[in-house]
């Protein structure tokens, strides 16, 4: 029991209510563990896997996962953390995005212990009367207790009525699924608590909630998001995942390891001690990047990614006289065009943009295709323009 509880709490931000979870575990029955994902984008990224990894831990402990695809709520758009109303997606867009979710999620979860559900199953049959009754369970004042709604209300920014429905529907999902535990990011706490309240209202035992930290993107500043371009998609090519992980700062590396690695706590502490004693952090980063690539693409692809990296950067492929440059970042990072100009690899930012468009720019061996890409503060990268221009750049 104690071991199971420690595994559940490992890496989590908050567990509510621990005593209730202990009582549920004492029953010895497999618990129903719920986590919902709105298919607002077609691909899952490493930020999503913080939750998926914890769900997998529950499976190892013998519990059943309810992976809820919010195809109905996806058409509303989660207002969490937004300072403006989010435009709803069409049914067609949500359905298309949901297709790839099921393929990707089983790279982490065991299909035999996973129940995939869609909240349109019950929400579309609820009807207008049912929706009004659901809305009547809570007040506007209660909704305004949510931090992002309160900020928008105080600054006189509009809050659409349908946005108040989102946490209610997410909470009602827990009623329909009879969830014992619900997982979510720290920014979802209000919505998760709504599930507890509604379960009590409908005469069910309230779910426990487990919040997980939000994973920063490769910029080390903002939450990982495809819209911000700071994400690492689990469907990306092995070399691309490996290269992106190798480009993050050393400080961010430890955050990623803590939230994403399956290595034991003792092994991770050993890495920390070795680095403190003088081991190059790059060695740890290689081991971690290999673990992540192997998880999503298999061990052979991971070994190949390491070999390709070593061939490029550790076996003399790079010039011995490559200049090393320290550059100051802007707002936590440095856009690639400016990095190339300041490193003396191009004549101007316009030239850099042309080189990127022509496929002639690489960072750590990976071709840059987005002129808006940035290198986060604290990262060291090998920048290459054409076949002969190189510089090892550290953004400070």
UniProtKB/Swiss-Prot annotation:
SUPFAM superfamilies associated with the record: Alpha-L RNA-binding motif, Nucleotidylyl transferase
Signal sequence region: none
UniProt lineage: Bacteria, Pseudomonadati, Pseudomonadota, Betaproteobacteria, Nitrosomonadales
EC number, as in UniProt: 6.1.1.1
Places the protein is found: Cytoplasm
The gene coding this protein: tyrS
Cellular component terms per the entry's GO annotation: cytosol
Taxonomic superkingdom: Bacteria
One MF term in the entry's GO annotations: RNA binding
Motif ('HIGH' region): 39-48
Annotated family: Belongs to the class-I aminoacyl-tRNA synthetase family. TyrS type 2 subfamily.
Species name: Thiobacillus denitrificans (strain ATCC 25259 / T1)
Subunit structure and binding partners: Homodimer.
Protein name per its UniProtKB record: Tyrosine--tRNA ligase
Residues of the S4 RNA-binding domain: 334-395
Segments carrying motif 'KMSKS' region: 223-227
InterPro entries (alphabetical): aa-tRNA-synth_I_CS (IPR001412), aa-tRNA-synth_Ic (IPR002305), Rossmann-like_a/b/a_fold (IPR014729), S4_RNA-bd (IPR002942), S4_RNA-bd_sf (IPR036986), Tyr-tRNA-ligase (IPR002307), Tyr-tRNA-ligase_bac-type (IPR024088), Tyr-tRNA-ligase_bac_2 (IPR024108)
Function according to Swiss-Prot or TrEMBL: Catalyzes the attachment of tyrosine to tRNA(Tyr) in a two-step reaction: tyrosine is first activated by ATP to form Tyr-AMP and then transferred to the acceptor end of tRNA(Tyr).
Main localisation: cytoplasm
Keywords in alphabetical order: Aminoacyl-tRNA synthetase, ATP-binding, Cytoplasm, Ligase, Nucleotide-binding, Protein biosynthesis, RNA-binding
Binding site for ATP: 226
Example GO biological process: tyrosyl-tRNA aminoacylation
Catalysed reaction equations from the record: tRNA(Tyr) + L-tyrosine + ATP = L-tyrosyl-tRNA(Tyr) + AMP + diphosphate + H(+)
């Amino acid at each position: 029991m104690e071991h199971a509880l420690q595994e559940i709490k490992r890496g989590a931000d908050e567990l509510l209510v621990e005593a209730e979870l202990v009582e549920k575990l004492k029953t010895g029955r497999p618990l129903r563990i719920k986590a919902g994902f709105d298919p607002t984008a077609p691909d899952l990224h490493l930020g999503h896997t913080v939750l998926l990894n914890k769900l997998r831990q529950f499976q190892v402990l013998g519990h059943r996962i309810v992976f809820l695809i919010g195809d109905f709520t996806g058409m509303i758009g989660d207002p969490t953390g937004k300072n403006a109303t989010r435009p709803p997606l069409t049914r067609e867009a949500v359905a298309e995005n949901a297709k790839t979710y099921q393929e990707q999620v089983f790279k982490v979860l065991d299909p035999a212990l996973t129940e995939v559900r869609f909240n349109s199953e019950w929400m579309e049959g609820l009807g207008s009367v049912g929706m009004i009754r659901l809305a009547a369970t809570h007040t506007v004042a209660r909704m305004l207790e949510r931090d992002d709604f309160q900020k928008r209300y105080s600054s006189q920014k509009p809050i659409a009525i349908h946005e108040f429905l989102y946490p209610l529907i997410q909470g009602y999902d827990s009623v329909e699924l009879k969830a014992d535990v619900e997982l979510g990011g720290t920014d979802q706490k209000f919505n998760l608590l709504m599930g507890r309240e509604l379960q009590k209202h409908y005469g069910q035992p309230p779910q426990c909630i487990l919040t997980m930290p939000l994973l920063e993107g490769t910029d080390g500043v903002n939450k990982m998001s495809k819209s911000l371009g700071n994400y690492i998609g689990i469907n990306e090519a092995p070399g691309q995942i490996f290269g992106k992980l190798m480009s993050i700062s050393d400080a961010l590396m430890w955050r990623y390891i803590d939230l994403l690695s399956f290595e034991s706590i003792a092994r991770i502490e050993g890495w920390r001690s070795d680095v403190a004693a003088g081991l190059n952090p790059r060695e740890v980063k290689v081991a971690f990047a290999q673990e992540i690539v192997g998880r999503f693409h298999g061990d052979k692809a991971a070994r190949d990614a390491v070999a390709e990296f070593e061939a490029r950067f550790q076996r003399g492929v790079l010039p011995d006289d490559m200049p090393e440059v320290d550059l100051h970042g802007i707002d936590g990072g440095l856009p690639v065009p400016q990095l190339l100009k300041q490193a003396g690899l191009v004549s101007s930012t316009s030239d850099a943009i042309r080189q990127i468009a022509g496929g002639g720019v690489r960072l750590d061996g990976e071709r840059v295709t987005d002129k808006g890409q940035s290198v986060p503060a604290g990262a060291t990268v090998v920048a290459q323009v054409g076949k002969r221009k190189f510089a090892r750049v550290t953004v400070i």
